[in-house]
């Protein structure tokens, strides 16, 4: 529902666009869900985040004149069409307003939530004249991770090219790969890794999917909190488990990425999107597994 509204399309437009083979899914599942969701919002006299953006855009277009000298936008690589229209409505009523956006197309991993990377890559096409300033120093990690991840990302020539440098030439972040096999092999390997780490160090366990935590057997205690957080303990060591998407922006002394295997539920994910989603999502990159590479 929010993807449909984020793209600025109505149910009628969706009906007219769908191909015959997708019509049963759209008319039998999607449209009834959207209509029931809208009905529920009316009953509770509530709006969601996308509603708030759409309503604010309509207010500006109908004559409301917000008086801003500067508009600052963070995480611009995640911008969606509804947010783009909102920014344009703010600028339209006050043309001298300066728009300052910070983003990194190497971190664009939320297409499934409605983001449209073309708005970032073709900024001047959508917003007019601009000046681009590059920030190429990272304070999160050092080499060899910086060099290896840069080469990995830039294999996709559609990514903006830049030379990322660590904040200090002495900063070091190592990458190690471990093979496992057989039932319980993953859990045993993780236990071996943990036993070699300093006791007072922080550790994150990450997976491409939330179900990856199940690869840890009975040697690990897994607790699912009411807030959705997953806590894992092994002996006296307590750790957080989360998906790679949930971990974005966080830091830890050590990070263990589980189940880097091939297959449908591996990393990269080989699960194909439903063709129905193409009606409400932006166009994907042409490079194979482009978003999965950025997630990794």
List each language-model region with its residue ranges.
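Conserved coupling/interface region of RecA-like P-loop/ASCE motor cores
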Residues: 107-166
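Conserved helicase motor "Helicase C" RecA-like lobe of SF1/SF2 P-loop NTPases
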Residues: 211-229
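Conserved helicase NTPase motor core
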Residues: 19-122, 137, 249
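N-terminal accessory segments
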Residues: 1-29
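Short glycine-/polar-rich loops that comprise or flank the Walker A/P-loop
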Residues: 95-97, 104-106, 127-132, 171-173, ...
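Conserved helicase C-terminal RecA-like lobe
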Residues: 199, 247-296
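Conserved helicase core region in the C-terminal RecA-like lobe
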Residues: 71-75, 102, 226-265, 295
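Inter-lobe coupling/hinge region of RecA-like P-loop helicase motors
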Residues: 130-137, 158-207, 239
């Amino acid at each position: 529902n929010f993807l449909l509204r984020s793209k600025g399309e109505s149910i009628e437009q969706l009906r007219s666009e769908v191909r015959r083979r997708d019509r049963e899914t759209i008319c039998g599942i999607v449209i009834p869900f959207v209509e029931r969701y809208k009905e529920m919002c009316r009953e509770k006299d509530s709006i969601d985040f996308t509603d708030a953006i759409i309503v604010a855009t309509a207010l500006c277009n109908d004559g409301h004149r917000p008086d801003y000298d500067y508009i600052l936008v963070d995480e611009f690589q995640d911008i969606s069409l509804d947010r783009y229209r909102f920014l344009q409505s703010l600028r339209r009523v006050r043309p001298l307003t300066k728009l300052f956006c910070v983003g990194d197309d190497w971190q664009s991993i939320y297409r499934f939530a409605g983001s449209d990377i073309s708005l970032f890559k073709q900024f001047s096409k959508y917003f007019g004249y601009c000046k681009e300033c590059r920030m190429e120093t990272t304070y999160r990690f050092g080499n060899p991770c910086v060099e290896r991840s840069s080469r990995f990302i830039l294999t996709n020539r559609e990514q903006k090219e830049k030379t990322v440098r660590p904040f200090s030439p002495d900063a070091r972040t190592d990458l190690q790969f471990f093979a496992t096999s057989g039932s319980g092999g993953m859990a045993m390997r993780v236990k071996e890794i943990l036993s070699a780490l300093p006791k007072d160090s922080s550790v994150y366990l990450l997976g491409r999917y939330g179900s990856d935590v199940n690869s840890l057997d009975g040697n690990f205690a897994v607790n699912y909190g009411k807030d959705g957080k997953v806590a894992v303990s092994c002996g006296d060591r307590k750790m957080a488990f989360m998906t790679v998407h949930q971990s974005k922006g966080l830091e830890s002394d050590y990070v263990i990425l589980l189940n880097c295997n091939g297959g449908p539920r591996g990393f990269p994910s080989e699960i194909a999107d439903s063709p129905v989603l193409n009606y409400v999502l932006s166009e994907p990159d042409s490079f194979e597994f482009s978003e999965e590479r950025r997630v990794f």
